[in-house]
Amino acid sequence: MLRFAVTLFAVITSSTCKKYSCLEGETHKLKPSPEPNMQECTLYSESSCCYANFTEQLAHSPVIKINNSYWNRCGQLSKSCEDFTKKIECFYRCSPHAAHWIHPNYTAGIQSVPLCQSFCDDWYEACKDDSACVRNWLMDWEWDESGVNHCKNECIPYSEMYVNGTDMCQSMWGESFKVSESSCLCLQMNKKDMMAIKYLLSESSEESSSVSSSEERACQKKLLKFEKLKEEEGGETR
């Protein structure tokens, strides 16, 4: 009994530390807190790892750059592609849960964050006709002395740079993201994430590489309830 209690305490403590801390990037807070005046990334306004003034860079379309990283080296992103790129940027900069997937060798980075297949496919569809000159947006740029990014190669369409949504999700941000085998225990960068994160945070480190069938069933059940509730709310507003 004592061993169980000690083990349970250790699991809860570890989960709590990850849940209520932020990544250690230049723009990250030490701990998440409310940011009611966010202009973008409002999904995380109740508990944010970024300050509201950071989101000013994302508030106006087209987005030119974030800090010293230019988004328009191959022309302005289409609005649909930009919207998905913002979702990823917002998660990394502002999500209070990103630190759950903190990179073991780089505390400002993330590793193997599970994205839903549908999200990756939609992201690819939104960006396939846009152009890029790097495959890995974290590592493949040429950086000048001022820390500004430049292309090393010619610009080509996303549809040529990446084979499909899976390839794009698992390549563009290096090893930051992976496509989940589950359609529920994964992130879509919307309000449904709060439900999925509840189950993802409860997974032990030993189970992190595989999907727990009991958690999958519980998540799917919650997802159905969530979607039914949203449909009912939509009907009431018509």
Curated annotation (Swiss-Prot):
Cellular component GO terms, alphabetical: external side of plasma membrane
GO biological process assignments: riboflavin transport
Post-translational modification: N-glycosylated.
The keyword Phosphoprotein is annotated on this UniProt entry: yes
Pfam families assigned to the protein according to its UniProt record, in alphabetical order: Folate_rec
Signal peptide positions on this chain: 1-17
Reported tissue expression: Expressed in egg yolk and egg white (at protein level).
Any GO molecular function: signaling receptor activity
Keyword annotations from UniProtKB, A to Z: Disulfide bond, Glycoprotein, Phosphoprotein, Signal, Transport
Residues of this chain annotated as glycosylated in UniProt: 53, 67, 105, 164
Cysteines engaged in disulfide bonds, as pairs: 22-49, 41-90, 50-94, 74-155, 81-127, 116-186, 120-169, 133-151, 184-219
Residues modified to Phosphoserine: 204-205, 208-210, 212-214
Role according to the record: Required for the transport of riboflavin to the developing oocyte.
Family per similarity comment: Belongs to the folate receptor family.
Note: On the 2D-gel the determined MW is: 47 kDa.
Identification of the protein by name: Riboflavin-binding protein
